[in-house]
Amino acid sequence: MAKIIGISGGSGSGKTTVVSKISEFIPEFVLISQDNYYKSVGDYEHEFSKVNFDHPDAFDNNLFYEHLKNLKKNSPIDMPLYDFINHKRQLKTVLVVPTPVVIVEGIMIFVEERVRNLIDLKIYIDTPNDIRFIRRLRRDISKRGRTVESVIDQYLNTTRWGYYRFIEPTKEYADLIIPEGGHNDKALYVLSTFLKSLSKEGLDFT
């Protein structure tokens, strides 16, 4: 069975940077982003401005769970791709062939117990709110076609609330908490040393 490493934390916490660091010590893995499992805005009965993307129900949780379960059993999946400009799932998918290690990252991957039970190593990135907001603002404007006003409005109305209601409480499930994300050199050194030892021992997380 494949080993799954889960990386969670608030939006803009530095999950991608930590994934990049892990890639230096685990040469072969597949990356699954929970973002690709957002539901299309067209699946909602109400207008886009009222859609809460910072709620667990914003994700296709059943498909996400089934795909992780299949990868853990070394079965390939057709991973969806989400279009953040048009806020809908693309028609095309990506064939993901499992490797001995699967890295999954997302803001709410530790919320559901059934998903947590599939993850062998749970890492939580704990980054200050102001830093996360600035990173999110820059990302959403440059990569997702958002305006400054829309990002601020979303943060004040749903993102901040969703973080404290759903995301931060999942720290209790983490095996490792990394303050400051990818900029915490000491924590990343500890993580890299741990992963090196696991690699030598055949990646047994038990």
Swiss-Prot record:
Pfam families: PRK. GO terms for biological process: CTP salvage; UMP salvage. HAMAP family: Uridine_kinase. Keywords: ATP-binding, Cytoplasm, Kinase, Nucleotide-binding, Transferase. It catalyses: uridine + ATP = UMP + ADP + H(+); cytidine + ATP = CMP + ADP + H(+). It is found in: Cytoplasm. Gene3D superfamilies: P-loop containing nucleotide triphosphate hydrolases (3.40.50.300). It is an enzyme of class 2 (transferase). ATP binds at residues 9-16. Its main location: cytoplasm. Belongs to the uridine kinase family. The keyword Electron transport does not apply. The gene is udk. One of its GO terms (molecular function) is cytidine kinase activity. This is Uridine kinase. NCBIfam families: PRK05480.1, udk. Pathway: Pyrimidine metabolism; CTP biosynthesis via salvage pathway; CTP from cytidine: step 1/3; Pyrimidine metabolism; UMP biosynthesis via salvage pathway; UMP from uridine: step 1/1. PANTHER family: URIDINE KINASE. Its EC number is 2.7.1.48. One of its GO terms (cellular component) is cytoplasm. Monomer. Transmembrane segments: none annotated.
